Amino acid sequence: MKRILAILLMLTMILSAAFAEGNPGAEDAQAGSPEVVRYDYDELVVGTAMPMYGAFSMDNWGNSTSDVDVRKLIHGYNLIEWNSAVSGFQLDPSVVTLGSLVTRDDAGNHVYSLTLYDDMYYSDGTKITAWDYAFSWLLRTSPLISEIGGATRQADYLAGWSDYAAGNTPYLAGVQVTGEYSLKITISAEYLPFFYEVSLLDCYPYPIQAIAPGCEVADDGNGVYIRNKENPDGGALFTADLLKNTLLNGTNGYLSHPEVVSGAYRLVSFDGAEARFELNPYYKGNSDGLKPVIPRIVFKTANNETMVDDLLQGKYGLLNKVSRADVIQDAMMRAISEGAYMADAYPRPGLSFITFNGGKSATADPEVRKAIALCLDKEALKDDYVGEFGVKSDGFYGLGQWMYQMVSGTISQEPDEGMTEAEKEQFQKDWDEVTLEGQETYEFNTGRANEILDAAGWTLNKAGEAYDSSKDDVRCKKIGEELVPLELKLIYPETTEIGEALDIWFAAPLKEAGILLTIETSPSVLPIYYGQDNTDYDMLYLATNFDVAFDPTQMFMEGGSVNVHGVKDAELVKLAGEMRQTEQGDLLTYCTKWISFLKRFTEVEPMIPVYSNVYYDFHPEVLQNYKITQYISWADAIVGSYFSDVAEEPAEAAE
């Protein structure tokens, strides 16, 4: 597994170069190519195969990749940002002034005293102040969110949040407003150390006038709270009923149709498949001093079967996160070889996986889950969908995660300059011992699956007699008074178009182990995953891209806000907690704990990792300064991009 990512990326570069230089038949293809497409330089149309669900303002209702992209486009001035140059989080220097500092109080809490710039505005011209950030924390972590179908954000890292979430106090002690443009954020000592500590300050401002009209944020010295703006002794206006209307209204609710925003663009319309945006004239720019140039953006769901044709016809100016092997190859052959288009490849910080319903008798059994995992031909399924642009996954990680890259040898940590030769040698030895080798991989083996099921007592047929594979279709087991058959249902998102491959490489092998699998598609799988839909299922086929601040505890803890019906495991939660409670900068210790977490993951097998892959973005050469590999999202990269007929000057020449 050593350097597998480097090899994969090298392969993609070789393929890109080969298609750019030409290939057999390329001249004929070019001869028949349509005339040069003329783009509307005032509008960029972005296409992706990943659907939008409309959670454009908060992650309390889901975190789909496309929704995250929209959030980054329309919400700005987060207190923190990811600095790719140092591979770490930092306070955003365009939002927080240099006079801000962090101290430790007598209780061991970390207190961040932040001073904000006074030149930030919402898209309607309203000034953004410290009160807007305070409202954001109060809203996202409020117990009212769960009353209207969302997941209250767990903020146990904030001092006093547990009392606020439980309704014991109306105020949030860990957030204080000390001036119109100054905040104090207190991180609880119980949560420290935290490897991604600065990421805990993740917060966009939200306009209280749009979400909670008639309310205001106050702070009497104990922490921030929400009260009536007028008639403070009257009935509280900040209620679940109010938020249900202002957040979830299908026409103008702030969750899916926010009008007043703080980002580079503002949302003009959204119909479920297409979102339109225009420049926010009040946006002052990002920390690099860049302001958006392209006046309008259209973001829409693209069809894998037609997206390359649409790119060549000028219907798209950017295809984002292209995954399917045949689509990538088609784009390379017909777009890149033509010479007027560009391709950017970057490793995915996530994976596709199959999650189990831990509330079902069959899939609650870890031995059943292991047997099911052995019946999935990951390599074949991967080849069918992402081909040479991906690798099968044997753990809960993605190719783009820094931990995977370090442990697999793609990148390395240099020893400190002051180390002696002996210390350097020991340092390297310690890193060599941190490896993915030896982890259970559940290689495709239906024979072993049958052995596991036999040993686990799944040895009866539907008549309650001994199971005989030569004449019985389904294994059963007596659990209590119920005879439970291994008749299972898997649901996958209709946009993935992977149903046929699942039939061949998963459902068919499962039959050999006495498991009958029904495969169904759904346009809304994520609401099931987040517990917002009561659809019956045994397994879900999903994909995720991890946050840079990797913290999987919510996935596996009782009462977690994601994977609500999934398998829970206290030991996994414990190991995830130990992983995050690592001193900042101690990469070796963090990766060592990460390996322990992955080992337990394979012992429990709460999910079946399937594959991780390299994403491709395709765009015409006239879209310039689009540097997706330096950012987390296309929405960040597009701020510095522009259309121009003048060829982009190479970086070396520019210097």
Regions found by a protein language model. Name each.
Residues 44-107:
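N-terminal lobe/hinge region of extracytoplasmic solute-binding protein
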Residues 46, 125, 311, 317, ...:
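Periplasmic binding protein-like
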Residues 98-153, 178, 184, 310, ...:
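Aromatic- and charge-enriched surface segment that lines or borders ligand/interaction sites
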Residues 150-240, 411-419:
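Surface-exposed binding/hinge segments that line
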Residues 199-292, 296, 446, 450-452:
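Gly/Pro-rich hinge or "lid" segments in bacterial periplasmic/extracellular proteins
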Residues 250-256, 273-276, 282-331, 516:
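Ligand-site clamp/hinge motif
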Residues 274, 375-424, 498, 502-507, ...:
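Detector for C-terminal structural segments
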Residues 364-507, 596:
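Append "and occasionally in soluble cytosolic enzymes with long acidic Gly/Pro-rich linkers
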